[in-house]
Amino acid sequence: MAAGALRGLAVAGGGESSESEDDGWEIGYLDRASQKLKGPLPIEEKNETFKKALTTGDISLVQELLDSGISVDSSFRYGWTPLMYAASVANVELVRVLLDRGANASFDKDKQTILITACSARGLEEQILKCVELLLSRNADPNVACRRLMTPIMYAARDGHPQVVALLVAHGAEVNTQDENGYTALTWAARQGHKNVVLKLLELGANKMLQTKDGKIPSEIAKRNKHLEIFNFLSLTLNPLEGNLQQLTKEETICKLLTTESDKEKDHLFSSYTAFGDLEIFLHGLGLEHMTDLLKEKDITLRHLLTMRKDEFTKNGINDKDQQKILSALKELEVEEIKFGELPEVAKLEISGDEFLNFLLKLNKQCGHLITAVQNIITELPVNSHKIVLEWASPRNFTSVCEELVNNVEDLSEEVCKLKDLIQKLQNERENDPTHIPLMEEVSTWNSRILKRTAIAVCGFGFLLFICKLTVQRK
């Protein structure tokens, strides 16, 4: 990091703030004239100069001060060491210099380790990754937790750093450890909406069924935080990615997960990890990664893929086996559309409870489908007007329709509340009605048992007959 590049105050990583807004660090630029020592300095002045050199990222001055005898593990106000500060701002060169001078990579302050501080640093993932790699090379333990029982991998997952997650696991980090609230790294990634991290954790063997203390699994956490794409992906029962990398050695895992770009490209990239889009995540979840290039060549989006017919699959070169995987996944995610002409008329007294419950369930599913559709539109809508390629009508038209839509949603909410109150009223009246006879539990009689057995026998015979007929036809 260049001298003077930092202006912000360093705080403890992972949301664990220090005891004061002023951690003893003076933020700002150091006068060029004072960057070289002009003779021996008193200890207090030397410490102050050391802090300023760390703050501005002045590597040469830091080295000069260390050469003059100042301790590399100096404890500043509130217990932070120079290495902890350098890690908190992801200053790779400063971290390297301090480690080479003997700084303790395993230091912690109130269970806030330097590795945790690095994983929760603010900066580019590439810089954070290099800092973490340096600390791990000096035997920093990736499984030491903070006061909230959060480990480095949880902080990396929470902040959306898939490469850092992969590196930590390659050095022995536990994927499925839980914090004080029962959150795993996967839960944190799902909560924050980091789909790349979710995908990587599943590949590394993360358990998507581990519950938090309030009984929620990662998919439910994602849904609660309106990350419906991740919710749908985690809800798929088929997960061929799970544990794909668990059998590899440490060296093989690092090589596979951290393939870097050429030196010329490193300075221009946020990371060397490929960002996955909606289509890639869907295909990875089904083990259909080989289809990615084919679909991209034909400009087929995820939305188009999900609405394809049988003949379109074949026309686009998708074989029957892959078609079946896609259709099976769609069936799991399918939201049944309501045909209002077929809905029961609530006014009829002979309507059954099952029919009415089915109506409410369908209505609820349809609302969820509408929410997902609107969220997808919000995600894909250009933020800046200059990114719109085709000419649009006046935005006022869209705004007015949205206002009408909001009014309709409010009206729907009001009517549903009325329906809920009415059902509650009917339930209370029924419970207080002295003439109401509660439903008796169904008692299995001798006749009913015979009837059930007869029905099972008939069904079994019919199935056997069907198999025989099918065999004859094939011959």
Curated annotation (Swiss-Prot):
Keyword Kinase: no
Entries under CDD domains matching the protein: SAM_ASZ1
InterPro entries in the record: Ankyrin_rpt, Ankyrin_rpt-contain_sf, Asz1_SAM, SAM, SAM/pointed_sf
Domain of life: Eukaryota
Chain spans, region Disordered: 1-23
GO cellular component: pi-body
Alphabetical UniProt keywords: ANK repeat, Cytoplasm, Developmental protein, Differentiation, Meiosis, Phosphoprotein, Repeat, RNA-mediated gene silencing, Spermatogenesis
Task performed by this protein: Plays a central role during spermatogenesis by repressing transposable elements and preventing their mobilization, which is essential for the germline integrity. Acts via the piRNA metabolic process, which mediates the repression of transposable elements during meiosis by forming complexes composed of piRNAs and Piwi proteins and governs the methylation and subsequent repression of transposons. Its association with pi-bodies suggests a participation in the primary piRNAs metabolic process.
Assembly behavior: Interacts with DDX4, PIWIL1, RANBP9 and TDRD1.
PANTHER family named among the record's database cross-references: ANKYRIN REPEAT, SAM AND BASIC LEUCINE ZIPPER DOMAIN-CONTAINING PROTEIN 1 (PTHR24157:SF3)
Protein name from the UniProt record: Ankyrin repeat, SAM and basic leucine zipper domain-containing protein 1
Organism from which the protein derives: Otolemur garnettii
Gene: ASZ1
